């Protein structure tokens, strides 16, 4: 921590440290503050102690943050509240098919090493369409490369029109999500939008932690490492279909 930096002359009411390396925690604690929260080395640097024995390792990430809030507020938040999604007019007339037959697929993720092969998702989509489902592909800006392929195979991409995204407002996607029966996805941002919109997901994991990034009650997971597979892209379609059949029993 150097005196000539952006924190000079500032003092924070509260700093919440999410570092896992002691040296970084020590540097962060040098920033002027009134109170400092840190789980590092069993709360040794923290002004707040874990006298309630809350769990902070190996848990769902949202529970992790609410446990932090519980200690700071000295009030345990047992139930994690749902989000009330405001109206979004742009989303109102895009999807008019029966929700019980609508299945969404989100083939993207922030990094390709977290993505199941797109062609495999396309194969799953074709199979589900033959069974009478309406398939909608949810593509973010980074998945624009799949847009034409989806359209050529007569699959709708409700977030897009004339080669451009209709809106980048998160409520737009979440309102569209509410019209879906479920979502098939990787561990990416779209999955979170669906889960917080109250839609169940079948989420495939490779390098990320399925326990940490799966919303309880809204997410069924596939961890490819459990099948002896190192890279998510190599997970076989037939094995995915078996998991999908089990997932459909829950939605």
PLM features per residue range, with description:
Residues 1-251:
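Catalytic machinery of carbohydrate-active enzymes
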């Amino acid at each position: 921590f150097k005196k000539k930096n952006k924190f000079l002359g500032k003092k924070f009411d509260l700093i919440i440290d999410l570092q896992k390396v002691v040296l970084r925690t020590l540097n962060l604690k040098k920033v002027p503050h009134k109170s400092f929260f840190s789980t590092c080395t069993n709360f040794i640097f923290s002004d707040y102690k874990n006298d309630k024995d809350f769990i902070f390792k190996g848990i769902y990430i949202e529970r992790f943050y609410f446990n932090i809030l519980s200690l700071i507020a000295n009030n345990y938040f047992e139930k994690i509240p749902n989000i009330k999604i405001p109206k979004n007019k742009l989303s109102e007339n895009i999807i008019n098919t029966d929700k019980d037959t609508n299945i969404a697929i989100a083939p993207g993720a922030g990094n390709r090493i977290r993505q199941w092969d797109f062609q495999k998702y396309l194969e799953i989509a074709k199979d589900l369409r033959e069974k009478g489902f309406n398939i909608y592909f949810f593509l973010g800006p980074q998945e624009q490369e799949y847009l034409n392929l989806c359209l050529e195979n007569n699959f709708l991409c409700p977030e897009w029109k004339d080669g451009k995204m209709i809106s980048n407002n998160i409520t737009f996607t979440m309102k569209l999500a509410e019209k879906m029966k479920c979502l098939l996805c990787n561990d990416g941002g779209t999955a979170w939008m669906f889960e917080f919109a109250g839609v169940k997901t079948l989420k495939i994991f490779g390098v990320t932690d399925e326990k940490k990034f799966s919303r309880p009650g809204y997410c069924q997971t596939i961890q490819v490492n459990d099948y002896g597979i190192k890279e998510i892209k190599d997970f076989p379609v037939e094995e995915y279909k078996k998991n999908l059949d089990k997932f459909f029993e829950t939605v």
